[in-house]
Amino acid sequence: MSILDVENLSVSFTEYTKGFRREKRTYISSLDLSVKAGEVVAVVGASGSGKSLLAHAILGILPKNATVGGTIKYNGEILTSSRQKTIRGTEIALIPQSVNFLDPLMKVGKQVQPPVQSGDAKTKQRKVFERYQLKNEVEKMYPFQLSGGMARRVLLSTATVSGAKLIIADEPTPGMDKAVLLEALNSIRELADSGCGVMLITHDIDSALTIADKIAVFYAGTNVETSPAEHFSGNGEKLRHPYSKELWRALPQNDFVGIEGVQPLVSQLPLGCLFEPRCKMATEECKKERPKMRSLRDGMVRCIHAT
């Protein structure tokens, strides 16, 4: 059974437009995704495709002007707002984008301890520090005294000290040098190998492929494909969706050919397939309605032409 099931998720915001008129705009639509215990599912896509919004919806930390549709299930039970609040930080934990998440005025040991709900918090904090090769004296340091790698390990400690079963890593590796990057990725893989379900949100497909079991490709507020990681290989012939193939071929080690056009703005989404205006395979049929996600060759795809 999946530890996380997202079914037909939509996220909309009520916003003020010109003339102080209120308008409801949908940023995520018809999104389906699952994460099993022991696996890393990497969520990749361009900025503005809805990756971080998905994380915030799962955690229940969207702003008050947000409206959420569809269902999110954790261990088979629907995540209501009250349940999200209860298990956030304990059973479901976030590894945030930036080390700026750490309070600059508080010693890091104290920052790691709050998620602990049973047993001695300091003992558990020291145990998780040992796991990530942080000495006891680190607990008395302030964030500015840490190296980049140490700060990342403190964030990992905060996310795992409570024994969380679902870890959401939101762009956890930006700006890292190669050594620190590999260390961070290995730590995330170890979480899955210990039985956690991990959702890794990233722009970096290459890094994701080193640890992910599956890759979910996002475009304009929904996922267009979920594929076994090993299908991202060669010329992308094993991939299903045209956008996934274009994304793969645009990498420097492949054809390094950019994708023509841009991802549409929320206010300018096409009525049919969201990728249709940029797709070389598009037909008139693609303009009529949004394709549904369907199973295909050990993966999932949202395209009527995929075979």
Where are these regions (language model features)?
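Q-loop/switch helix immediately C-terminal to the Walker
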Residues: 98, 104-118
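ABC ATPase C-loop
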Residues: 154, 159-160
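P-loop NTP-binding/switch modules centered on Walker-like glycine-rich loops
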Residues: 176, 180-254
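Conserved ABC ATPase signature
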Residues: 142-146, 150
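Conserved ABC transporter NBD signature motif
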Residues: 67-78
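ABC ATPase NBD coupling module
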Residues: 78-93, 232-239, 268-270
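A short, proline-enriched helix->beta-strand linker immediately N-terminal to the Walker B motif
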Residues: 161-165
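Short catalytic/signature loops enriched in Gly
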Residues: 228-307
